[in-house]
């Protein structure tokens, strides 16, 4: 799934320890240089050492995702509210594992592509933002929108990435919904945990 590769690669470029207070577009822009430099300087280790790769995904990417909000969205309100609190926690942990594995597969695919940010327009809500960009590839352009939500401490976390109209979370939600309808939530959690 080529688009998923780009979604992941693009997000990784913007994941950084400075992803905190301030305008979300500023932090996304500042992160590009830091992460692309890290990837360039550590390409061999990222390619050859799975433990190093996993630790970098845990350090650079996962803390920047709003796993709880993502979990609610991919399951849908009905499924989320039907689960007990321990089941929700278990699902979040399994979904987090899926994110780690997914980003591990794509971290090394960055090849110096350029990204241009469109002018940021603040929305009606101060706690939600959408940052638009264009990812310049050899094959053409990809339009990328980042959906972010401000957490309780005032930092921003990404909860969805949309590339050329395709939402990462909508894709997962569609897959998960089909699985839940066929086999139930417990089966989905078990499958996420076993991969």
What spans do the regions from the language model cover?
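Sec-dependent N-terminal signal peptides
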Residues: 4-15
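Sec/Tat signal peptide C-region and signal peptidase I cleavage site
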Residues: 16-20
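Early exported N-terminus immediately downstream of N-terminal targeting peptides
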Residues: 23-103
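Short leucine-rich amphipathic alpha-helices used at interfaces
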Residues: 46-47, 51-53, 57-59, 64-66, ...
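A mature extracytoplasmic/lumenal domain signature
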Residues: 95, 121, 135-137, 148-150, ...
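Surface-exposed, charged secondary-structure patches
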Residues: 101-142, 195
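Short beta-strand edge/turn micro-motifs at domain boundaries
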Residues: 143-170
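Low-complexity, intrinsically disordered terminal/linker segments enriched in charged
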Residues: 160-195
